[in-house]
C-alpha cells in the first residue's frame, strides 16, 4: 500500500467541517445521513465533513462479509453497510470517524482519484492519532486497519478498523478506534475476517484516557495527512 508523507505547516491552508454527536447515534440514521451528505457533496450543495459518533451495539457487514463469521450470541442488530470489508462491531466506547470528502481533488498528502493513497492516509491518521496518546500503532501488509501490541497479552491486536465506500468519487464511512468498549462483544464475529488476532483498546494502555482525549488527538493529527484544519460544523 502506498505511503503518504506528513505535510509541512506551510502546506496546510484549507478547512474541513468537523462534527461530534453526543450520545449514541442509531446506525440506520448514520447510514442515511452519510449517503445524503455524500450525494450533496457530489452535487456541490454541501461541504466535506468529518463526523465523530458512537453507536449502540451493532454488527455491520461489508461487501465481503461471510455468514459463517457471524455468531452474535447477544442478538445485536445486524446491518448491511455497503462499505468495503467484512464484519465489524460498533458499540459504546468506540469512536467512529466518518469521512465524507471529494476525492476528485487532492487532499493534503492524498492525490486526486487515488483510493489506495486515501486508505493509506486514513490509516496514517489513526497511527498519528494514537501516537499522540502514547500508543505505538502500525499497519500490516494484507491486513486492513491499525494494530498494536496488547499490553495485557503481549500479542498483536487490532485497535483501529477501516471501511470505506466511494460514490461518484465522494467517500463515506471511515474509521473506528476502540477507547473503552466491552471487548467481549467482538466475540460475536470474526472481526474483519481475521481469526488469528484479537482486539484491544486505549484503556488497556492508560485507564485515564477518555473519548474526549481521542477526539482532541484526531483533530490534531488530521491536518498532517489531509491538509485541512478542522472547523466546528
From Swiss-Prot:
Residues 44-230 form the BPL/LPL catalytic domain. Pfam families: LplA-B_cat. This is Octanoyltransferase. GO terms for molecular function: lipoyl(octanoyl) transferase activity. InterPro entries: aa-tRNA-synth_II/BPL/LPL, BPL_LPL_catalytic, Octanoyltransferase, Octanoyltransferase_CS. The active site is at 192 (acyl-thioester intermediate). One of its GO terms (cellular component) is cytoplasm. It comes from Gluconobacter oxydans (strain 621H). CDD domains: LipB (cd16444). The record marks 158 as: Lowers pKa of active site Cys. In the reaction, the free carboxyl group of octanoic acid is attached via an amide linkage to the epsilon-amino group of a specific lysine residue of lipoyl domains of lipoate-dependent enzymes. The lineage of its organism: Bacteria, Pseudomonadati, Pseudomonadota, Alphaproteobacteria, Acetobacterales. It is found in: Cytoplasm. Catalyzes the transfer of endogenously produced octanoic acid from octanoyl-acyl-carrier-protein onto the lipoyl domains of lipoate-dependent enzymes. Lipoyl-ACP can also act as a substrate although octanoyl-ACP is likely to be the physiological substrate.
Amino acid at each position: 500500500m502506498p505511503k503518504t508523507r506528513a505535510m509541512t505547516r506551510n502546506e496546510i491552508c484549507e478547512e474541513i467541517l468537523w462534527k461530534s454527536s453526543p450520545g449514541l447515534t442509531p446506525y440506520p440514521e448514520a447510514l442515511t445521513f452519510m449517503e445524503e451528505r455524500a450525494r450533496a457533496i457530489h452535487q456541490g450543495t454541501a461541504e466535506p465533513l468529518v463526523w465523530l459518533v458512537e453507536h449502540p451495539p451493532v454488527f455491520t457487514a461489508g461487501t465481503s462479509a461471510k455468514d459463517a463469521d457471524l455468531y452474535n450470541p447477544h442478538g445485536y442488530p445486524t446491518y448491511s453497510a455497503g462499505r468495503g470489508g467484512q464484519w465489524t462491531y460498533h458499540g459504546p466506547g468506540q469512536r467512529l470517524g466518518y469521512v465524507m470528502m471529494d476525492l476528485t481533488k487532492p487532499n493534503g498528502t492524498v492525490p486526486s482519484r487515488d483510493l489506495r493513497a486515501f486508505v493509506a492516509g486514513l490509516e496514517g491518521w489513526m497511527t498519528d492519532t494514537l501516537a499522540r496518546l502514547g500508543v505505538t500503532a502500525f499497519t500490516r501488509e494484507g491486513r486492513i486497519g491499525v494494530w498494536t501490541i496488547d499490553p495485557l497479552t503481549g500479542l498483536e491486536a487490532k485497535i483501529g478498523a477501516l471501511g470505506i465506500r466511494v460514490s461518484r468519487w465522494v467517500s463515506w464511512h471511515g474509521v473506528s478506534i476502540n477507547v473503552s468498549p466491552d471487548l467481549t462483544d467482538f466475540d460475536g464475529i470474526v472481526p474483519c475476517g481475521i481469526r488469528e488476532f484479537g482486539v484491544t483498546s486505549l484503556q488497556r494502555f492508560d485507564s485515564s484516557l477518555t473519548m474526549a482525549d481521542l477526539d482532541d488527538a484526531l483533530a490534531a493529527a488530521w491536518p498532517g495527512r489531509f491538509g485541512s484544519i478542522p472547523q466546528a460544523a
